[in-house]
A protein has these predicted regions:
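Alpha-helix boundary/capping detector
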Residues: 81, 105-109, 189
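Bacterial N-terminal signal peptides that target proteins for export
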Residues: 1-7
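Aromatic- and glycine-rich peptidoglycan recognition patches
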Residues: 25-27, 134, 138-225
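...with weaker cross-activation on analogous glycine-rich loops/strands in unrelated enzymes
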Residues: 40-42, 91-173
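Short, flexible active-site loop motifs that bind/organize anionic cofactors or intermediates
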Residues: 10, 68, 115
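C-terminal motif of bacterial Sec signal peptides marking the signal peptidase cleavage site
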Residues: 18-19
Length: 225
């Protein structure tokens, strides 16, 4: 039986959203992590901790029901459901077109009620956005901004960000290291960057596949007090 998560007390409006399917930014160099603030342990607020706890409870889930209604099972729908559990609707204030990209709806919400940043230090519960994780406009080019979103769980001492998202068949943990964006794993087998884009036979030569290569920006919706 497939794992199923049911959230009680929430309401999701049915909508057809496009985005996050499949596993416009040039990152030829990594981000330097020599700041004293980089990669230090960040104390999360109770609300940030609660958001992360909800996200971890979804790991392995393949369907998510809210008030008996199954929500859109993509990265944006999962991210929205997690925040809705804590009284925040990430779709509020975003474009309402029937076939809107859910990731861009969330991004528009943050422009109004949150803040964007590039790190290097991130907080538990932050959002992380990615570009070009699939050919959204189906033109065969690498020109698809804001195609994926996840929720930061933690940041390790080496700068690797662990985030939770739905990429393939289920909600899972994924890794991203912005200091070494082109490295999948170290010689000793530690994963630094997971693959977020599937390799296709007709991909352009400049196509990237790893999380660090596809990174766009972080966003804070629930700020430190």
């Amino acid at each position: 039986m497939m794992p199923r998560i049911v959230f009680i007390g929430l309401l999701i409006t049915a909508a057809t959203l496009v985005g996050c399917a499949g596993v416009a930014r040039d990152r030829t160099q990594g981000i330097a992590l020599d700041s004293q603030d980089c990669c230090r342990t960040v104390d999360a607020t109770p609300r940030q901790t609660a958001i992360v706890r909800t996200a971890t409870q979804l790991i392995g889930a393949r369907t998510i029901d809210v008030n008996g209604r199954r929500i859109a099972y993509d990265c944006a729908g999962v991210t929205r459901a997690i925040y809705l559990k804590h009284g925040i609707d990430l779709y509020q204030g975003g474009p309402s077109a029937r076939h809107a990209n859910g990731v861009r709806i969330i991004h528009a919400h943050i422009r109004q009620q949150g803040t964007f940043h590039q790190g290097p230090t991130v907080h538990p519960g932050d959002l992380v956005f990615f570009d070009n994780t699939w050919d959204f406009n189906r033109d065969g080019k690498v020109n698809d901004p804001l195609t994926h979103v996840g929720i930061v769980e933690r940041q390790d001492q080496d700068g690797t960000v662990i985030f939770i998202s739905r990429v393939a068949g289920a909600v899972e943990r994924y890794h991203m290291n912005l200091a070494l964006p082109h490295v999948h794993k170290t010689a000793d087998g530690r994963i630094l960057n997971d693959y977020l884009r599937r390799k296709g036979a007709i991909d352009p030569a400049n196509t990237d596949y790893l999380a660090g290569e596809l990174f766009s920006q972080f966003a804070t919706r629930v700020a430190q007090q």
